[in-house]
């Protein structure tokens, strides 16, 4: 079974090699490594690994944290192969789709691009009430909810402890980030339950992708 391991590691040469060695000695294969961000002497890495049959996920944590200075921020099951060209494929699909289907396609595919749990596209009425234009599988219900940040002028992180969230959502530690889609009254929200919190680098990546997607989705189909 595949897992997505998010590590906070010392930003020094050889550290990923040490992690790879520790995992390999435990019979764990690394599928891919994605450096999310670095600064302040540390780096944040997403590592997709294959866990051998019969091994417990805890063995990933034990092996990783056996390397001095390495901390496991999160461990989640990972469904599907990592595709470094997925963003380009999404944009190409949006270019071929009619505008109304492009929104649904965007919501369906973004969770795979960002290794998140779900995505929704919301439309606001200017007073905080929202309507769901499209939603991926596993997305919670936003219809009729008051979201004080909509209209949205710029992308932002939406932490799980925010006061506007339903109590049930706070208990589930639902982490989100949002970006305008075409106009301040329409926003794309990407979320994951139980964390980890989205990083600033993930938000910047979202801004870039959604900005291009908004332009592509509003063009006539190719």
Place the predicted regions along the sequence by residue.
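A conserved regulatory-domain signal marking ACT and ACT-like small-molecule sensing domains
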Residues: 1-95
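Helix-loop-beta substructure at the N-terminus of cytosolic sensory domains
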Residues: 99-138
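Amphipathic alpha-helical "output/dimerization" segments
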Residues: 198-214
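Short alpha-helical interdomain "coupling" segment at the junction between an upstream regulatory sensor module
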Residues: 216-222
């Amino acid at each position: 079974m595949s897992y997505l391991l998010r590590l906070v590691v010392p930003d020094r040469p050889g550290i990923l090699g040490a992690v790879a060695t520790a995992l390999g000695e435990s019979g764990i294969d690394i599928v891919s490594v994605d450096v999310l961000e670095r600064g302040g002497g540390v780096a944040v890495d997403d590592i997709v690994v294959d866990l051998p049959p019969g091994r417990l996920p805890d063995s990933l944590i034990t092996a990783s944290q056996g390397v001095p200075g390495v901390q496991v921020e999160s461990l989640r099951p990972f469904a599907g192969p990592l595709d470094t060209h997925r963003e380009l494929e999404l944009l190409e699909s949006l270019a071929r789709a009619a505008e109304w289907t492009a929104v649904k396609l965007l919501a369906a595919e973004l969770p795979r691009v960002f290794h998140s749990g779900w995505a929704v596209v919301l439309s606001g009425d200017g007073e905080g009430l929202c309507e769901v234009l499209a939603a991926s599988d596993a997305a919670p219900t936003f219809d009729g909810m008051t979201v004080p940040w909509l209209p949205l002028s710029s992308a932002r992180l939406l932490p799980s402890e925010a006061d506007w969230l339903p109590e049930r959502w706070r208990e589930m530690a639902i982490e989100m980030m949002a970006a305008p889609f075409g106009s301040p009254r329409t926003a794309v929200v990407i979320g994951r339950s139980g964390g980890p919190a989205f990083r600033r680098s993930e938000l910047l990546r979202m801004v870039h992708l959604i900005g291009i997607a908004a332009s592509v989705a509003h063009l006539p189909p190719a």
